Design a protein with these regions (language model features):
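S-adenosylmethionine
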Residues: 1-186
């Protein structure tokens, strides 16, 4: 639920009035008892709500952004975590995505939700190409991984992986962490 637009309690009332059973999950989420196509979820196209896994939503809650903080969301596409950070506090987020098409996806997500961030298509590890020199209060890095955590939703994931993927992805994660760690305020 986009906290800048509606409370979870008010959204639950709206769903109830439409005959859509749902329940509150955590501090800011609502779960429909039966799935609906995204286009049929009340308020989705208007930016009132987003669709996210419960685990994904925890990223913003754990980071707990504060007013005026500078936050970097690296490897940010499709923009759900970026948006959730911005919905949680009046903070400033820089969202990086290496793929320009996926960076555009972040922009469209933020536009739909009526929140603003600085979105850049850049390799997060190539700091000199995108960084202004300002330190960040926090960094959210959802580094490329084997996607083993989404097998429940996408059972074909194990079949699309190669034996060398874990080692290759671990090197990429290390490269990103080593590049970004120095940008956090001491």
């Amino acid at each position: 639920v986009n906290a800048r637009r509606i409370t979870p309690a008010a959204y639950l009332e709206e769903l109830k009035a439409r005959g859509i059973p749902a329940l509150r999950v955590g501090r800011s989420a609502v779960m429909l008892e039966s799935p609906l196509p995204v286009k049929d979820i009340p308020g989705f196209s208007e930016g009132i709500v987003s669709v996210q896994d419960a685990g994904t939503q925890l990223a913003a809650e754990i980071l707990a952004p504060q007013k005026n903080e500078q936050i970097l969301d690296a490897c940010a596409a499709p923009g759900g975590k970026t948006a959730h950070l911005l919905e949680s506090a009046d903070c400033h987020v820089t969202a990086l995505e290496i793929d320009p098409k996926r960076a555009e996806l972040i922009k469209s997500t933020l536009l739909r939700l009526r929140v603003e961030a600085t979105v850049r298509a850049a390799d997060a590890a190539m700091v000199s190409e995108w960084h202004s020199g300002r330190e960040f209060d926090a960094i959210l890095l959802d580094a490329p991984c084997t996607a083993s955590g989404i097998v429940r939703r996408q059972p074909d994931v194990p079949w699309s992986r190669r034996p060398e993927d874990p080692a290759r992805l671990a090197r990429e994660q290390e490269r990103l962490l080593n590049a970004l760690w120095p940008l956090v305020k001491k």
